[in-house]
Amino acid sequence: MTRLNVKPTRMELNNLKARLKTAVRGHKLLKDKRDELMRRFIESVRENNQLRQKVESALVGHLQDFVMAKALESDLMVEEIFAVPTREVNLHVETENIMSVRVPKMHAHIDNPHTDDEGDVVYSYVASNSQMDETIESMSDLLPDLLRLAEIEKSCQLMADEIEKTRRRVNGLEYATIPDLKETIYYIEMKLEEAERASLVRMMKVK
């Protein structure tokens, strides 16, 4: 604890008591914020881990299917197939306020412009094998999960940064500001009591 460099006056004592009251209230609010952020962070990390496992597992399967489908086509044919996007995505990114942390919220509108009336993918004049069609369609279906994964991971990063900042502020109040204020208040109260006793002794001597 470090005593503040202030004059031991009653006015200063009242000011320090007001500051202490504010610091204690701020400490509680920051602890509540930290605890709620931790709760949200843990929930998001849990969802992130589950979704990442799902996406990675799906990607491994789709890539294996793609390798097999690609073996049935020439390199030129594969280039032609991927020259035509099967999905068009309009992405709108907003932010959501979570305990003063602005986290991203993605809204995606996904169109399938290159499908026929029955929903089958078409590639202009390119004719691919059915296995390639199914693989490309399956990969395209992963897009919503990939966007959600990006959203969650960015949110986790932002919340982790804010949790660390809040933790430092809580510790600063708990282990420095509040103890220093209490120590200084105690010092001033002792000084004022000493002054009162000295004044009382002088008055008694005068009498």
From Swiss-Prot:
<comment type="similarity">
    <text>Belongs to the V-ATPase D subunit family.</text>
</comment>
<dbReference type="GO" id="GO:0005524">
    <property type="term" value="F:ATP binding"/>
</dbReference>
<dbReference type="GO" id="GO:0046961">
    <property type="term" value="F:proton-transporting ATPase activity, rotational mechanism"/>
</dbReference>
<dbReference type="GO" id="GO:0042777">
    <property type="term" value="P:proton motive force-driven plasma membrane ATP synthesis"/>
</dbReference>
<protein>
    <recommendedName>
        <fullName>V-type ATP synthase subunit D</fullName>
    </recommendedName>
</protein>
<dbReference type="Pfam" id="PF01813">
    <property type="entry name" value="ATP-synt_D"/>
</dbReference>
<dbReference type="InterPro" id="IPR002699">
    <property type="entry name" value="V_ATPase_D"/>
</dbReference>
<keyword id="KW-0375">Hydrogen ion transport</keyword>
<keyword id="KW-0406">Ion transport</keyword>
<dbReference type="GO" id="GO:0046933">
    <property type="term" value="F:proton-transporting ATP synthase activity, rotational mechanism"/>
</dbReference>
<keyword id="KW-0813">Transport</keyword>
<keyword id="KW-0066">ATP synthesis</keyword>
<comment type="function">
    <text>Produces ATP from ADP in the presence of a proton gradient across the membrane.</text>
</comment>
